[in-house]
């Protein structure tokens, strides 16, 4: 029985679990991508693996791109300063 549990756990680790999140996509220096149109944000987001994206007007960081179902390996805006 223990072998079955260990093998199941090993298979889970080997296959990996990929998750997604909705967030402001960020540049490497923790700065958002400012925007004016939904089309530009949708292209930026989908090019980075998200399902879609749009320009969030008047949000927390001004007019910035918000991505829906963005992969975990793509940087997002986190609390703290933008380091330009």
From Swiss-Prot:
GO terms for cellular component: extracellular region
Coiled-coil segments on the chain, per record: none
GO molecular function: sodium channel inhibitor activity; toxin activity
Cellular localisation: Secreted
GO biological process, alphabetically ordered: defense response
Signal sequence, renumbered to the chain: 1-19
Propeptide: 84
Source species, domain of life: Eukaryota
Segments traversing the membrane: none
Keywords assigned by UniProt, alphabetized: Disulfide bond, Ion channel impairing toxin, Neurotoxin, Secreted, Signal, Toxin, Voltage-gated sodium channel impairing toxin
Pfam families on file: Toxin_3
SMART domains named in the record: Knot1
Predominant cellular place of this UniProt entry's protein: secreted
Gene3D superfamilies (alphabetical): Knottin, scorpion toxin-like
Residues of the LCN-type CS-alpha/beta domain: 21-83
Expression sites (tissue/organ): Expressed by the venom gland.
Disulfide bonds: 31-82, 35-55, 41-65, 45-67
Domain free text: Has the structural arrangement of an alpha-helix connected to antiparallel beta-sheets by disulfide bonds (CS-alpha/beta).
Function: Alpha toxins bind voltage-independently at site-3 of sodium channels (Nav) and inhibit the inactivation of the activated channels, thereby blocking neuronal transmission. This recombinant toxin selectively inhibits the fast inactivation of mNav1.4/SCN4A (EC(50)=82.3 nM) (tested in HEK293 cells).
Misc note: Negative results: does not inhibit rNav1.2/SCN2A (EC(50) is >30000 nM) channels.
UniProt-recorded name of the protein: Neurotoxin BmK-M11
Originating organism: Olivierus martensii (Manchurian scorpion)
Lineage: Eukaryota, Metazoa, Ecdysozoa, Arthropoda, Chelicerata
């Amino acid at each position: 029985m223990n072998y079955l549990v260990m093998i199941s756990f090993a298979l889970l680790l080997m296959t990996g679990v990929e998750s997604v999140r909705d967030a402001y996509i960020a540049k490497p220096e923790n700065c958002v991508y400012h925007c004016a149109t939904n089309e530009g944000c949708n292209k930026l987001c989908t090019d980075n693996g998200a399902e879609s994206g749009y320009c969030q007007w008047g949000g927390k960081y001004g007019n910035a791109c918000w991505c829906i179902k963005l992969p975990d390996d793509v940087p997002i805006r986190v609390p703290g300063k933008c380091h330009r």
